[in-house]
């Protein structure tokens, strides 16, 4: 993944800089997300690494995307096709989203809980994280019954393990040392 990120970063940065300059960050986010989904489609994926000439591949890809991709987005697709990089479009989209979140002072946090969190609990977690991180927080909630109780919160390098299984594990380590 690190190698893909290294290759994809210049494309994502160029697209992001262009989007900011033209006040079109949200439309570029939608466009790259859609194009990324197209590139991951099982019918399209084999063509990205196939024997089609870059101009044919770009034309086909743009036709499949239709009106979801504007002229500047089509230019990005053409450049990536010429360089044999359409296969990393999903990584470009992810990096673009990271640039967008940084620019908008937003961060995503993964919250794993033993049971489904109520909207009030989600709001409390969101408010606490926003204070701690000084950013707007978007929660991605999931359920893992093996936690027994509590939550695990991950955002970037921050990991908060408030799960019962995590506490039991730490207690076990202390007792064994």
Curated annotation (Swiss-Prot):
| Segments traversing the membrane | none
Molecular-function GO terms, alphabetical: proton-transporting ATP synthase activity, rotational mechanism
Keyword annotations for this protein, in alphabetical order, are: ATP synthesis, Cell inner membrane, Cell membrane, CF(1), Hydrogen ion transport, Ion transport, Membrane, Transport
Q: Chief location of this protein? A: membrane
Q: How does it sit in the membrane?
A: Peripheral membrane protein
**Cited Gene3D superfamilies:** N-terminal domain of the delta subunit of the F1F0-ATP synthase
**Gene Ontology CC annotation, any one:** proton-transporting ATP synthase complex
Domain of life, per lineage? Bacteria
Protein's cellular compartments: Cell inner membrane
What InterPro entries does this protein map onto? ATP_synth_OSCP/delta_N_sf (IPR026015), ATPase_OSCP/d_CS (IPR020781), ATPase_OSCP/dsu (IPR000711)
Family, per entry:
Belongs to the ATPase delta chain family.
What functional role does this protein have? Answer: F(1)F(0) ATP synthase produces ATP from ADP in the presence of a proton or sodium gradient. F-type ATPases consist of two structural domains, F(1) containing the extramembraneous catalytic core and F(0) containing the membrane proton channel, linked together by a central stalk and a peripheral stalk. During catalysis, ATP synthesis in the catalytic domain of F(1) is coupled via a rotary mechanism of the central stalk subunits to proton translocation.
How it assembles, according to the record, is: F-type ATPases have 2 components, F(1) - the catalytic core - and F(0) - the membrane proton channel. F(1) has five subunits: alpha(3), beta(3), gamma(1), delta(1), epsilon(1). F(0) has three main subunits: a(1), b(2) and c(10-14). The alpha and beta chains form an alternating ring which encloses part of the gamma chain. F(1) is attached to F(0) by a central stalk formed by the gamma and epsilon chains, while a peripheral stalk is formed by the delta and b chains.
Which protein, by its recorded name, is this? Answer: ATP synthase subunit delta
The organism of origin for this protein:
Shewanella frigidimarina (strain NCIMB 400)
């Amino acid at each position: 993944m690190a190698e893909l990120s290294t290759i994809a970063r210049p494309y994502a940065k160029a697209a992001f800089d262009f989007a900011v300059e033209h006040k079109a960050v949200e439309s570029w986010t939608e466009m790259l997300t859609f194009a990324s989904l197209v590139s991951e489609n099982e019918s399209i994926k084999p063509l990205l690494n196939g024997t089609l000439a870059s101009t044919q591949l770009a034309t086909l890809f743009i036709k499949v995307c239709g009106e979801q991709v504007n002229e500047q987005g089509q230019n990005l697709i053409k450049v990536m096709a010429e360089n044999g990089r359409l296969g990393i479009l999903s990584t470009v989209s992810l990096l673009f989203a990271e640039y967008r979140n940084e620019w908008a002072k937003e961060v995503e946090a993964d919250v794993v809980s033993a049971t489904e969190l109520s909207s009030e609990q989600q709001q409390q977690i969101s408010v606490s994280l926003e204070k701690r991180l000084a950013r707007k927080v978007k929660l991605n909630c999931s359920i893992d019954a093996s936690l027994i109780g509590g939550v695990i919160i991950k955002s970037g390098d921050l990991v908060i393990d408030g799960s019962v299984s995590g506490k039991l594990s730490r207690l076990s380590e202390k007792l064994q040392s």
